[in-house]
Amino acid sequence: MSYPIPQWRVVLDGTDLTERIAPRLLDLTLTECRGGEADQLDLRIHDHDCKMALPKRGVRLSVALGWKATGLIDKGTFIVDEVEYSGAPDIITVRARSADLTADMRTRRERSWHNTTLGAVLNTLAGEHRLTPRVAEVLARTKLPHLDQANESDMNLLTRLGQRFDAVATVKGGALVFAPIGAGTTATGKSLPTVTLTRRDGDQHRYSVADRDAYTGVRAYWVDKGKARRQSVLVGTDDNAKRLRESYADEATARQHAHAELERVKRGVAKFDYTLAIGRADLFPEQRLTASGFKKEIDEQRWLIAKVTHVIDGSTGFSSSLQLESSS
């Protein structure tokens, strides 16, 4: 009986290190996130003979994953920002994060925008960091009467805007991506494929559903300066409404935050974690997914991939763990 053979490739600043590392590799872990967090690559390498040099921080690692039968899938480029050497036995641990998140994007700034659009702000951020803006049109035309960036990095601003509009807000592959979560499309409008997984595809699963998170609406507050009093807006119904603590500058901003929070609440009611025995490098966050062969509640629910963790090691081969949220 033949078994599938995992395949991987690691390139350091243009030099392919795969053959050199392969006999020493304990495990390779790649975590892909939807936004707000950088994708992360972790390598653990055995250094029993002390012949491996410690990599320098700031070097670039490119990684590809797959199977010998189907080939490799490029998973991006990462910058080494953490190195650990421990023993005995001697082990080198290398941690790298998305190469697109440069130090300049983490530098704090002070500025404001007036009478503009969300698309204009995001285009400015992309241009300053030599990124290609990929902003969904439905969000790009949103009006922003005022926006402050006070002692805040561009990356934090991008994340904050993603929270405000319930959007994927990230930097990947040389592009600044901003698109509605769960839309099933890329920022350019191209449809993402829906994946179907059966119970036979995995060896571990965990499903949970909780009424405590089943809010019927979200109420947000804003300060009416003309009337010098606190007002509120409600998105959804008031039967069991969640109340946001922060007070916003105007009604439109409060409504945007309430709408975004309600969408997050809906996705968080049911959760499904699934580990695939045969890793799938083609899976990534924001893909829609359907399940088959589980309980009725799982099979009838449409799912959205929130996070994927790919692991290659000597004992389990290549596996992929999915964190799924319920999708409307």
Residue map of PLM features:
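Extracytoplasmic/secreted envelope proteins and their assembly/folding machinery
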Residues: 77, 119-122, 155-159, 217, ...
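Conserved "cap/hinge" positions at secondary-structure junctions
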Residues: 65-67, 180, 287, 293
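Short beta-strand-centered interaction patches in the first periplasmic/extracellular domains
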Residues: 4, 91, 97-100, 137-202
